[in-house]
Amino acid sequence: MGDIVLSARAITKRFTEGRLDVTVLQGVDLDVRAGETLAIVGASGSGKSTLLHLMGGLDAPTSGSVFLHGQDLAHQSAAAQGRLRNQYLGFVYQFHHLLPEFSALDNVAMPLWIRRLAPAESTHTATEMLAKVGLQERLAHRPSELSGGERQRVAIARALVTRPACVLADEPTGNLDRSTANGVFELMLELARVQGTAFVMVTHDESLAERCSRRIRLVQGRLLEAF
């Protein structure tokens, strides 16, 4: 089993507005290890996406701590959190969130530009990653010129181009037909194996979850492991 790359300790999340006071997550503990594929399942409203956002440092827990590569995110400035996310995490969503005016190649190179890599190196690395996801012939195509499955593969390539320790994926196949979803999911499993990247995936699809190396279920904000 690989080293722990991301962990949550006693995570609780409450949302309050006026008289409304809802506890979405209650005392969640979770470790994510290098190279594992972890599925988070549960009913709508069980806190799956909220947990993913907290683990990614996109929101702060009401109480508890999130550790990314051993660093407590609560003790980091917003700028430091951003640097940690860019260094260690990748994100994939149900909707690809690609920039429509940019080519597939430029979308994938974007995280490398943010890291201030040289343009030639960024282009070379992004081209290699797109080849790994089978899109070496689609480098110059914009998102509107790609199929749904191709757009999601570009999004996966973008998430992986910096070789992150962990990719957080929120319903990454939820907007795809069954055949395309299977292809995208197999790609994620293969890249986890080859690159040693951990994948944490929120999904409603139990059949896909069963193919992950580990599964957890959220029930009324509490975590049930190894079902």
From Swiss-Prot:
<protein>
    <recommendedName>
        <fullName>Lipoprotein-releasing system ATP-binding protein LolD</fullName>
        <ecNumber>7.6.2.-</ecNumber>
    </recommendedName>
</protein>
<keyword id="KW-0547">Nucleotide-binding</keyword>
<dbReference type="GO" id="GO:0005886">
    <property type="term" value="C:plasma membrane"/>
</dbReference>
<keyword id="KW-0067">ATP-binding</keyword>
<dbReference type="InterPro" id="IPR003439">
    <property type="entry name" value="ABC_transporter-like_ATP-bd"/>
</dbReference>
<dbReference type="GO" id="GO:0022857">
    <property type="term" value="F:transmembrane transporter activity"/>
</dbReference>
<feature type="binding site">
    <location>
        <begin position="42"/>
        <end position="49"/>
    </location>
    <ligand>
        <name>ATP</name>
    </ligand>
</feature>
<keyword id="KW-1003">Cell membrane</keyword>
<dbReference type="InterPro" id="IPR003593">
    <property type="entry name" value="AAA+_ATPase"/>
</dbReference>
<dbReference type="InterPro" id="IPR015854">
    <property type="entry name" value="ABC_transpr_LolD-like"/>
</dbReference>
<dbReference type="InterPro" id="IPR011924">
    <property type="entry name" value="LolD_lipo_ATP-bd"/>
</dbReference>
<comment type="similarity">
    <text>Belongs to the ABC transporter superfamily. Lipoprotein translocase (TC 3.A.1.125) family.</text>
</comment>
<feature type="domain" description="ABC transporter">
    <location>
        <begin position="6"/>
        <end position="227"/>
    </location>
</feature>
<keyword id="KW-1278">Translocase</keyword>
<comment type="subunit">
    <text>The complex is composed of two ATP-binding proteins (LolD) and two transmembrane proteins (LolC and LolE).</text>
</comment>
<keyword id="KW-0997">Cell inner membrane</keyword>
<dbReference type="GO" id="GO:0016887">
    <property type="term" value="F:ATP hydrolysis activity"/>
</dbReference>
<dbReference type="GO" id="GO:0044874">
    <property type="term" value="P:lipoprotein localization to outer membrane"/>
</dbReference>
<keyword id="KW-0472">Membrane</keyword>
<dbReference type="GO" id="GO:0005524">
    <property type="term" value="F:ATP binding"/>
</dbReference>
<dbReference type="InterPro" id="IPR017871">
    <property type="entry name" value="ABC_transporter-like_CS"/>
</dbReference>
<comment type="function">
    <text>Part of the ABC transporter complex LolCDE involved in the translocation of mature outer membrane-directed lipoproteins, from the inner membrane to the periplasmic chaperone, LolA. Responsible for the formation of the LolA-lipoprotein complex in an ATP-dependent manner.</text>
</comment>
<keyword id="KW-0813">Transport</keyword>
<dbReference type="InterPro" id="IPR017911">
    <property type="entry name" value="MacB-like_ATP-bd"/>
</dbReference>
<dbReference type="InterPro" id="IPR027417">
    <property type="entry name" value="P-loop_NTPase"/>
</dbReference>
<dbReference type="GO" id="GO:0089705">
    <property type="term" value="P:protein localization to outer membrane"/>
</dbReference>
<dbReference type="Pfam" id="PF00005">
    <property type="entry name" value="ABC_tran"/>
</dbReference>
